[in-house]
């Protein structure tokens, strides 16, 4: 499929909606200062039961019953590719066995969020993504919903404690697991309120120490041009547009020579038919260790992360994220990393940049057409929880410098936001985008 210049311009400008001041690395989120419990939770179906293909409403209250919330949900059929599979590795990095990922095993939903401004009068306030872990009269679920552009993150207390930093508030301990919620606006430092911080100029940034990212001839560092002539730009320049600092030109930013100030937020030309970008994920020993060697829990966490992150791209570009390949390392970290999977090493070995380099070389050997591969780990480097190559989306092969479409994401309380920020989609992903057409929908309906 060919994509027109109109879509290219729209996609690049729309990127600024979410990827403001973006670059090749992500810092850890600020401390969580406040959490709320979900009360009066009801799944509005007969017997409060659902399955993977159900459409239903969930209602609950937050902030000590002060605010009623309704989530109107339907299945997210795109979160898993039809032929999605998981590979389980041995300690030496060789493949132990491979299994298909059955969509029916994962109750993953998308939809909208509503608030009750007066009795029986509900107002739309944003989008919603949920992964239901338990249905019935006492349900448990995790996910995210947006209320007036403030992300509300729902986690089981056990999941929250798994990623809690020393500065985060500690929810009350109870006899049984329960759901807690924190907003992005509940995350701030004592003196300044920020969300996930990304900063290129900091010389301590691990991404800046990568020779490829620091190359002054890289397209993302080229000065702005007088004309935003997309048709005259080289493919390399287009690749570089995935890094953004400022879309208005000037000293602080670079857009590969395009000034997009007048078109930020304009989605004219975006695809009318939904497209899906297929992505591969590998998890290292440290990631699985965070789940107590529970492979099912780790797999569900990755799928839930995809579900939430995809909402940003669906609403902006009409492009969804779909998990195609999942490669899982055993929980026991090797004393010496294998030559097959050199990225699988203890947190005490290497840093986030060396993990990216090793993982990218491995990614280059994979025979697939995925748009991107992500390594999930539990090993930050200082405050850095994400790193990627500049402008390398859809680059499949590795070079002598081991540069390709890959990134590293560290498990955090808001890992879905790190994941979303590090895979800015662009419209030349022709090899990895597929139409969600009528035939596909018919196959999904037949599976019910």
Where are these regions (language model features)?
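Classical protein tyrosine phosphatase
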Residues: 6, 129-146, 300-317, 431, ...
């Amino acid at each position: 499929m060919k994509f027109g210049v109109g879509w290219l311009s729209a996609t690049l400008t729309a990127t600024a909606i979410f990827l403001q001041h973006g670059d090749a690395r992500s810092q850890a989120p600020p401390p969580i200062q406040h959490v709320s419990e979900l009360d009066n939770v009801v799944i509005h179906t007969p017997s409060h039961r659902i399955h993977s293909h159900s459409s239903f409403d969930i209602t609950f209250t937050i902030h000590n019953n002060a605010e009623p919330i309704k989530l109107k949900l339907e299945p997210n059929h795109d979160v898993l590719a039809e032929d999605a599979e998981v590979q389980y590795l041995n300690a030496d990095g060789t493949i132990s066995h491979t299994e298909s990922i059955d969509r029916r095993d994962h109750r993953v939903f998308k939809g909208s969020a509503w608030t009750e401004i007066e009795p029986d009068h509900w107002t739309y306030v944003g989008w919603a993504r949920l992964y239901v872990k338990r249905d019935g009269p006492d349900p448990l679920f995790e996910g995210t919903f947006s209320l007036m552009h403030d992300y509300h993150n729902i986690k089981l207390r056990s999941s929250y404690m798994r990623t809690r930093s020393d500065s985060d508030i500690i929810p009350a301990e109870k006899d049984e697991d329960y759901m807690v919620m924190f907003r992005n606006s509940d995350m701030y430092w004592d003196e300044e309120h920020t969300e996930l911080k990304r900063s290129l100029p900091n010389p301590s940034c691990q991404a800046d120490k990568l020779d490829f990212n620091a190359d002054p001839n890289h397209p993302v560092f080229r000065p702005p041009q007088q004309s935003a002539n997309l048709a005259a730009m080289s493919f390399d320049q287009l690749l570089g547009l995935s890094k953004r600092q400022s879309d208005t030109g000037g000293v602080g930013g670079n857009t590969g020579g395009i000034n997009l100030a007048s078109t930020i937020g304009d989605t004219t030309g975006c695809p009318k038919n939904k497209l899906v970008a297929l992505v591969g994920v590998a998890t290292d020993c440290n990631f699985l260790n965070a789940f107590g060697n529970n492979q099912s829990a780790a797999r569900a966490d990755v799928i839930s992360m995809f579900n939430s992150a995809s909402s940003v791209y669906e609403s902006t570009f009409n492009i969804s994220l779909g998990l195609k390949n999942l490669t899982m390392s055993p929980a026991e970290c090797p004393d010496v990393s294998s030559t097959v999977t050199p990225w699988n090493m203890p947190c005490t070995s290497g840093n986030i940049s060396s993990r990216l380099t090793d993982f990218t070389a491995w990614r280059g050997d994979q025979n697939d057409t995925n748009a991107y591969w992500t390594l999930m780990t539990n090993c930050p480097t200082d405050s850095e929880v994400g790193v990627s190559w500049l402008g390398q989306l859809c680059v499949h092969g590795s070079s002598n410098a081991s540069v390709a479409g890959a990134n590293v994401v560290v498990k955090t309380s808001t890992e879905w936001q790190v994941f979303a920020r590090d895979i800015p989609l662009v419209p030349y992903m022709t090899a990895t985008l597929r139409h969600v057409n009528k035939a596909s929908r018919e196959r999904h309906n037949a599976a019910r």
